[in-house]
Design a protein with these regions (language model features):
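Basic amphipathic alpha-helical segments that dock to polyanions
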Residues: 54-61
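Amphipathic alpha-helical dimerization/coiled-coil segments
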Residues: 2, 92-126
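N-terminal helix-turn-helix DNA-binding core of bacterial DNA-binding proteins
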Residues: 9-53
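Short, Lys/Arg-enriched N-terminal segment that forms or immediately precedes the first helix
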Residues: 1-10
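Beta-hairpin "wing" of winged helix-turn-helix
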Residues: 64-80, 88
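A generic structural micro-feature
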Residues: 13, 79-83
Length: 126
């Protein structure tokens, strides 16, 4: 992905795993387990990301330049080389996240205009 990002739209749609990881990192850096917890919270438990999916996706996202490993330690006292790796969005990752969120919002708007989505969920409409 990193070689030819002259036209990032070519890489949309993002996979659900990549989208959820980018979304989890949107408000700051996190370690892998923190990302898994954030994805679970953001999706109200509907998406449970296991370590294989998470770290496979992280590896590809690092190579693509969507995220980077943080050089900073969350706790300066942690000088143990076995410390957890922390990840953060790059400018490209934030741009791709925004583009995908806009694409998804457009799809939701279409569903609304076709009366697929209930406008008042408190009434239990379907």
């Amino acid at each position: 992905m990193a070689e030819s990002l002259q036209n990032p739209e070519e890489y949309l749609p993002l996979t659900p795993a990549v989208f959820n990881i980018l979304l989890a990192l949107a408000d700051g850096e996190k370690h892998g387990y923190g990302i898994m917890l954030e994805v679970e919270a953001n999706t109200k438990g509907q998406v449970l990301m296991g370590p294989g999916t998470l770290y496979g996706s992280i590896k590809r996202m690092l190579q693509a330049g969507l995220i980077e490993e943080s050089d900073e330690r969350a706790d300066p006292e942690m000088d143990d080389p076995r410390r957890r790796a922390y990840y953060r969005l790059t400018a490209l990752g934030r741009r791709m996240l925004r583009m995908e969120a806009e694409r998804l919002a457009s799809q939701v708007q279409i569903a609304k205009t076709k009366n697929i989505l209930a406008t008042d969920f408190s009434r239990g409409a379907t």
